[in-house]
Amino acid sequence: MAKISVSRLTKMKQDNQKITCMTAYDASFAAIFDQAGIQVLLVGDSLGMVLQGHDSTLPVTVDDIRYHTAAVVSTAKSAFIIADLPFMSYSTPEMSYENAAILMRAGANMVKMEGGEWLTDSVKGLVERGIPVCGHLGLTPQSVNIFGGYKVQGREEEQADELLNDALLLQEAGIQLLVLECVPVSLADRITTALKIPVIGIGAGCETDGQILVMHDAFGVSAGFCPKFSKNFLLETGDIRQAVTLYIDQVESRQFPSAEHSFY
């Protein structure tokens, strides 16, 4: 299979084809996901919770992401690889340039940043320097202490309008993908329709251009809490490879996420 490019992902949006994404942190699972046909792998700062055992993503460092990105890239030959810029690693444009370069040298195809309008200067600078950027709006886990917990965002009209405006500003600044997390289905639909770039949802309903899950949630192996928006695909299949195939099939056929996995 040919290497997935951002232009291929954009074409999938234009053709109304669903994009399938999953987090990955090591070579073994990256190979399974890649061979199954997952188009995008995210080396997420979620590793702080599912691998390191923290109660948030805040302790994760750039070196953590660099290490796991290199592991994923070693076996994922077709999937498009996105690496998270972790908490406080992009507070200024200059910091974002330096830390994004580290992740790109590790093999990432794109870096992801959480935040709205305040990121536009950094996004422009990164793109000018040849580094593709994925945005992340809605529930941004690095801001959990501002939100007062992991809560659905955009239910109030004013905040919904602000999120839509942020998405448009980030697109204008140069992001080529957007992750939209834990927002009502109606808002996700508005943002997905308004943007030319692909929108990847997690807890955002089935109207986005694609879906992403934390792999530990998708296999039901997360310690403790399992989010409402997730589903244990391993429970239905009993086999990891079959579970990945089921996830792909249900995303492509719009069976997942269903109403029970969505917010209104």
UniProtKB/Swiss-Prot annotation:
* InterPro entries in the record: Pantoate_hydroxy_MeTrfase, Pyrv/PenolPyrv_kinase-like_dom, Pyrv_kinase-like_dom_sf
Which reaction equations make up its catalytic activity?
3-methyl-2-oxobutanoate + (6R)-5,10-methylene-5,6,7,8-tetrahydrofolate + H2O = 2-dehydropantoate + (6S)-5,6,7,8-tetrahydrofolate
Catalytic machinery residues: E181 (proton acceptor)
The domain of life is: Bacteria
**Biological process (GO) annotations?**
pantothenate biosynthetic process
Which E.C. number(s) belong to this protein?
2.1.2.11
Q: Which GO terms describe its cellular component?
A: cytoplasm
Q: Which GO terms describe its molecular function?
A: 3-methyl-2-oxobutanoate hydroxymethyltransferase activity; magnesium ion binding
* A Pfam family that the UniProt record links to this protein: Pantoate_transf
Note how many cofactor molecules are bound and how: Binds 1 Mg(2+) ion per subunit.
Q: Has the keyword Cytoplasm been applied to this entry?
A: yes
Which cofactors does the annotated protein need, by name? Mg(2+)
Residue positions annotated to bind 3-methyl-2-oxobutanoate are D45, S46, D84, K112
Residues bound to Mg(2+) are D45, D84, E114
Report the pathway entry. Cofactor biosynthesis; (R)-pantothenate biosynthesis; (R)-pantoate from 3-methyl-2-oxobutanoate: step 1/2
What are the subcellular locations of this protein?
A: Cytoplasm
Indicate whether Magnesium appears among the record's keywords: yes
Family assignment? Belongs to the PanB family.
Subunit comment: Homodecamer; pentamer of dimers.
Q: Which HAMAP family match?
A: PanB
Functionally, this protein is described as follows: Catalyzes the reversible reaction in which hydroxymethyl group from 5,10-methylenetetrahydrofolate is transferred onto alpha-ketoisovalerate to form ketopantoate.
Put simply, this protein is called: 3-methyl-2-oxobutanoate hydroxymethyltransferase
- Which species expresses this protein natively? Psychromonas ingrahamii (strain DSM 17664 / CCUG 51855 / 37)
